[in-house]
């Protein structure tokens, strides 16, 4: 199966379109074409080896934010000071998402409380068939511990590989993830929210920790607690069991869209260039 991180594909398309048009709000028709053409292109490239597309979406609500309220705080804060029309951007993306679910012949998986990361990780841990993850997100490197899992970045147009998956996730947990608002294990929860500097964490210190049980080498109880915080937020094996079960139930019960709807949809949305390649969808 080809597991598509739809949030990344869709956001990359809309940002590229707005950059090209030099406007602060998207042109829905062009964004729609770019997203659909990306799916066509990746399906054509990977179908024969990995099978059909499975479209994985972020829920509007994340379990990680319940556990750690400052999760992805910097992204929310950044949007508040941005000149882009984010209401229109998200409205456009939601419209196209609904159209894709209704009209395209692929399984779409979205589960309340789950991010696409949780969906992709759950399916990778459950199925032994050949799997291609379409995402540039390095969080997925940890899933390459499964020998049947590969990853391709639509951003760099290259395979994502060359890392030891188990070492990578350990280092990632120690360092945290600035883009997701997760401080390193030496730093408190409020580091990014309150504009504090992270406490320095050297490569030498990480190397000294990596082959040990962290409880044996952590300098104090606060750092042990921060380690558990990061482990739960970053290591995808910590997706809650009940959520993983719901993801699997949703995947198994979801039918692919009706391919016969595709032509009428393309005509309705005036996707004439894509109509010529309809057999590739």
Where are the model-predicted features located?
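Extended two-metal-dependent nuclease catalytic cores across DNA- and RNA-processing enzymes
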Residues: 49-50, 77-265, 269-281
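Domain-level signal for Mg2+-assisted phosphodiester chemistry and nucleotide/NA-binding surfaces
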Residues: 1-98
């Amino acid at each position: 199966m080809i597991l598509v991180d739809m949030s990344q594909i869709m956001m990359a398309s809309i940002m590229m379109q707005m950059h090209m048009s030099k406007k602060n709000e998207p042109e829905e028709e062009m964004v729609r074409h770019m997203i659909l053409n990306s799916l066509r292109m990746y399906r054509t490239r990977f179908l024969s080896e990995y099978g059909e597309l499975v479209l994985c979406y972020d829920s509007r609500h994340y379990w990680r934010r319940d556990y750690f309220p400052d999760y992805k705080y910097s992204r929310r804060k950044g949007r508040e000071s941005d000149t882009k029309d984010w209401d229109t951007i998200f409205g456009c993306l939601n419209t196209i998402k609904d159209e894709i679910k209704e009209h395209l012949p692929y399984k779409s998986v979205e589960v309340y409380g789950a991010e696409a990361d949780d969906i992709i990780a759950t399916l990778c841990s459950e199925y032994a068939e050949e799997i291609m993850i379409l995402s540039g997100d390095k969080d997925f490197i940890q899933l390459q511990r499964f020998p049947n899992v590969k990853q391709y970045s639509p951003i760099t147009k290259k395979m994502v590989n060359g890392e030891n998956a188990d070492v990578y996730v350990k280092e990632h947990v120690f360092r945290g993830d600035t883009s997701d608002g997760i401080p390193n294990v030496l730093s408190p929860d409020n580091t990014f929210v309150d504009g504090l500097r992270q406490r320095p964490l050297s490569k030498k210190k990480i190397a000294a920790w990596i082959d040990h049980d962290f409880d044996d080498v952590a300098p104090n109880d606060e750092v042990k607690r921060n380690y558990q915080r990061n482990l739960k937020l970053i290591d995808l094996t910590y997706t809650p069991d009940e959520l993983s079960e719901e993801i699997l139930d949703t995947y198994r019960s979801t039918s692919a869209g009706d391919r016969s709807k595709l032509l009428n949809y393309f005509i309705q949305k005036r996707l004439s260039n894509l109509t010529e390649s309809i057999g590739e969808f």
